[in-house]
Amino acid sequence: MKRKLTALLCASLLTAALPFPACAAETEASLQKVTLNEVAHSIFYAPQYAAIELGYFAEEGIDLELVCGFGADKVMTAVLSGDAEIGFMGSETTIYAYNQGANDYVVNFAQLTQRAGNFLVAREEMPDFDWDDLKGAMVLGGRKGGMPEMVFEYILKQHDIDPLADLTIDQSIDFGSTAAAFSGGQGDFTVEFEPSATALEKEGVGYVVASLGVDSGYVPYTSYSAKSSYMEEHPDIIQGFTNALQKGMDYVNSHTPAEIAEVIAPQFPDSDLETITTIVTRYAEQDTWKENLIFEEESFTLLQDILDTAGELSGRVPYENLVTTEFAENAAK
């Protein structure tokens, strides 16, 4: 009798448990799969990672797959080919594609950062650093035509320094490999994103002497974009995606660097919590993140001015052709 009761109890428990996996499967199936290809995986993009880790994309019905493209050109290729529904990169790339005659051109719908996120790293501490110190130096720079390099050159020109004549900028090293090259002895200075800048400091081979974000002023550095056809066919997904990002932005703007670091730490398993906190603090103090995701027309004009100054603009593009603020405005309500 005892065995019979035990068997019945086990059977009852098993039967009761069956609906839960089924419900979980139904919930998972109801989420829309979206692939986001990001230009780099950096703490610079903390609001995005906060949105991922806090489940905001799932709340908006999105099963987000995050892929790192390691360069804006590669992100754009992924979006145009359909390998990614959404790209996260410097919006200058959308201008290049448009001017090259893309039929189904890629449109920006949300701006995440409003300052450059890279830093100038020297081989020794330079508390009295001046941009003139770069004259005659070898600097490990970024890809020609990319935002990191153009903003760097924009700052140089603001200080009456000719990027071609007054210093040597090495643009031959792949994105993501400059820190290793600098650590190995190449260059007098290097332009680095985080966590590479802090890693060089911890290694004792480099010292941050200037912030390109501070010295360049407010710049529409990185934004989210998708093919115009995809946005027309899936406005609900774009809106849900933007809503999730706005929640991430709200979280970052209302919490301390320590709290933010703890939330996004799973995204950076190779960095300890103290390092992540230091980097978040550095970005927060220079007013990196906007309060909303609206890509203003003045920002787009400034972006084209920077491209023009760098000699990378073949023709001005109308703001309304490559930017929509509809989704960001709705998310900010």
Regions found by a protein language model. Give the residues of each.
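Predominant activation on well-ordered alpha-helical scaffold segments within soluble catalytic domains
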Residues: 49, 95, 153, 198, ...
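Soluble non-cytosolic domains of exported or imported proteins
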Residues: 42, 69-73, 88, 142, ...
